[in-house]
Curated annotation (Swiss-Prot):
Signal peptide feature range: none
EC number in record: 4.1.1.11
Enzyme class: lyase
CC annotations in GO: cytosol
Annotated source species: Bacteroides fragilis (strain ATCC 25285 / DSM 2151 / CCUG 4856 / JCM 11019 / LMG 10263 / NCTC 9343 / Onslow / VPI 2553 / EN-2)
SUPFAM superfamilies: ADC-like
Organism superkingdom: Bacteria
Cited InterPro entries: Asp_de-COase-like_dom_sf, Asp_decarbox
Function: Catalyzes the pyruvoyl-dependent decarboxylation of aspartate to produce beta-alanine.
Protein name per Swiss-Prot or TrEMBL: Aspartate 1-decarboxylase
Bound cofactor: record note: Binds 1 pyruvoyl group covalently per subunit.
Amino acid sequence: MMIEVLKSKIHCARVTEANLNYMGSITIDENLLDAANMIAGEKVYIADNNNGERFETYIIKGERGSGKICLNGAAARKVQPDDIVIIMSYALMDFEEAKSFKPTVIFPDPATNSVVK
């Protein structure tokens, strides 16, 4: 049996922009993507800690080292700059494999969205 489990999580990143006039997605600093084991085009689930919104979109790679977390298109209506969001991706895997699987979870610096070691 296959089940869906948490694969990666960027916990408590700060939204830097909301761009309504860009075709959908979330732009994420490439350093954060690497640290969280996420890739461009990957489907993500986003929870906004400030307003309780939850929604899905896909990733666009942002400039490395920029700290950028930008919600684009319709998703821009769901957040405000400086909101704190949790960005999660999931993977399908065999039930037995899932029992021992450990997701990648990162906690970026809340002021800069830089990767904290």
